[in-house]
Swiss-Prot record:
Gene Ontology cellular component terms for the protein in this record: cytoplasm
HAMAP family, per database record: HisH (MF_00278)
Name of the protein this chain belongs to: Imidazole glycerol phosphate synthase subunit HisH
Name of the coding gene: hisH
Subcellular location: Cytoplasm
Length: 212
């Protein structure tokens, strides 16, 4: 089994690769690539992302990878992480950027005036936060509802279709932090920075056949 981790220069790539390799129990060939053909030929695809969405979209197009992402999401198990997940939506408020349009909806910024417990919440949302599962999914196997994952983001998903939301978190209002449909699964948090729970989710992805 070949698992492509898309390298377009904008992700926490080596940490993602190392985390996947740490839970690779069945000898999968897990590799970084910026070759669109290699992405399309892979059996599974991981799409990390870190930084500003306009920069990520520009680099994705510069390397000719946007169409490869669109093609692989049609049928293969696909895992988007952080900005890699945000890019799946139609539009982001960050830099008024068009996304790949695979999911209906947009990516919006947290309000700067949010208050919880009498204190103003900082943007970006950074640190450990609980994730509440709203739908069952194979990638939740072995992960408790309310488990903590590691977040670093100023923008979050606003899906136009509620059925896309698989899990939510609070900051302080509820927001979608895992979205998915069919063979696509995408997280706002960084699985590669989320210790045991993040590794379990990556392990589940390697075992997943893309069916829900």
């Amino acid at each position: 089994m070949k698992v492509a981790v898309i390298d377009y220069g904008m992700g926490n790539l080596h940490s993602v690769l190392k985390s996947l390799q740490a839970v690779n129990e069945n000898g999968a060939d897990i590799f970084l690539t910026r070759d669109p053909e290699a992405v399309v030929k892979a059996d599974k695809v991981v799409f990390p992302g870190q930084g500003a969405m306009p920069d990520c979209m520009r680099e994705l197009n510069r390397h000719g990878l946007a169409e490869a992402v669109r093609e692989t999401t049609q049928s293969k198990p696909f895992f988007g992480i952080c900005v890699g997940a945000q890019l799946l939506f139609e539009h982001s408020e960050e830099g008024d950027t068009a996304g790949l349009g695979l999911f209906p909806g947009k990516v919006v910024r947290f309000a700067d005036d949010q208050v919880a417990g009498g204190e103003r919440l900082k943007v970006p949302h950074m640190g450990w936060n609980q994730v509440y599962q709203t739908r069952s999914h194979p990638l939740f196997a072995g992960i408790a509802d309310g488990e903590r994952f590691y977040f670093v983001h100023s923008y979050h998903f606003a899906p136009a279709d509620a059925a896309l939301t698989l899990a939510e978190s609070d900051y302080p209002q509820r927001f979608a932090c895992i979205v998915g449909r069919g063979n696509i699964f995408a997280t706002q948090f960084h699985t590669e920075k989320s210790h045991r729970a993040g590794l379990q989710m990556m392990k589940n992805f390697l075992a997943w056949d893309g069916n829900v």
